[in-house]
């Protein structure tokens, strides 16, 4: 596929994403700010989890051109678009996050400094999400950061009033923002992909792989599930850095190993000729 054609499809992808996520760019900016501040590096190794066609990764590279971005996804359509448009800057790797052995397929030789994801992990079941977070902790360096931008809701089982109010506010805001005919939808974009002769074979492959079949798992859209799973996986601090309603940027810091007390020097407390004890 020619890069120009791929970029046109990605532009349409970005527009249809912005229809339901008006603050998408603001969340991207906040996430990249956090990567920059948390790593303190000009050349971090960053895993873009559920990367799609590379919308987040290419924005991160605009801010941090020295970064190495590894995009991982199982979708053959968006991977093909990303490789054609941004393959010279992002390393796109076909990985199914439901596969417990996914870290072995990463084209890296050291732990990552950061892992990022936007609007992707909500399709995993709770069991798959917990397993993914456990393996993610193993591929991040101690002190590394994980950032997840997504709609994560309050748990109706433990906070029923907050959950109901949050969803009501989201629905009311959607009604104000999205009148009839507001733009191309997620379904409309994929219908166009399927109808395109150049992309139809990849769309058929996507369907055969069952990619996105569990989209919007009821468990993985709950904030409490992500927080609990991250802490259980060994992330020391978990909290929200940026938020607009249920649309939030969740941050987790990989637990660093405990610092061992320094062994006492054999000279400690010994009298030094010509001086006192040191």
Which residues are covered by each model-predicted region?
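Core SAM-dependent methyltransferase catalytic element
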Residues: 233-278
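Class I SAM-dependent methyltransferase SAM/SAH-binding core
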Residues: 55-102
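A conserved beta-strand element that flanks and buttresses the S-adenosyl-L-methionine
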Residues: 116
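Conserved class I S-adenosyl-L-methionine
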Residues: 1-42, 55-59, 147-176, 181-185
């Amino acid at each position: 596929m020619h890069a120009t054609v791929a970029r046109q499809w990605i532009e349409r992808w970005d527009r249809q994403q912005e229809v339901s996520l008006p603050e998408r760019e603001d969340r991207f900016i906040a996430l990249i700010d956090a990567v920059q501040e948390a790593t303190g590096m000009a050349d971090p190794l960053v895993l873009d989890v559920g990367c799609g066609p590379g919308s987040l990764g290419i924005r991160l590279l605009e801010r941090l051109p020295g970064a190495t971005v590894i995009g991982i996804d199982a979708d053959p359509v968006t991977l093909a678009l990303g490789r054609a448009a941004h393959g010279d800057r992002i390393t796109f790797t076909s990985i199914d996050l439901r596969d417990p052995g996914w870290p072995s397929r990463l084209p890296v030789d050291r732990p990552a400094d950061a892992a990022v994801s936007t609007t992707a992990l909500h399709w995993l079941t709770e069991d798959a999400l917990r397993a993914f977070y456990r393996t993610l902790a193993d591929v991040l360096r101690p002190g590394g950061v994980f950032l997840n931008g997504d709609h994560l809701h309050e748990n109706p089982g433990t906070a029923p009033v907050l959950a109901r109010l949050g969803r009501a506010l989201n629905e009311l805001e959607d009604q104000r923002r999205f009148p009839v005919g507001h733009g191309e939808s997620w379904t409309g974009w994929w219908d166009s992909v399927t109808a395109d002769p150049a992309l139809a074979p990849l769309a058929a492959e996507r369907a055969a792989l069952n990619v996105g079949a569990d989209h919007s798992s009821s468990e993985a859209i709950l904030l409490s599930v992500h927080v609990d799973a991250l802490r259980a996986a060994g992330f020391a601090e978990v909290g929200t850095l940026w938020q607009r309603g249920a649309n939030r940027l969740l941050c987790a810091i990989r637990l660093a190993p405990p610092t061992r007390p320094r062994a006492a020097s054999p000279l400690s407390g010994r009298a030094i000729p010509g001086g006192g004890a040191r």
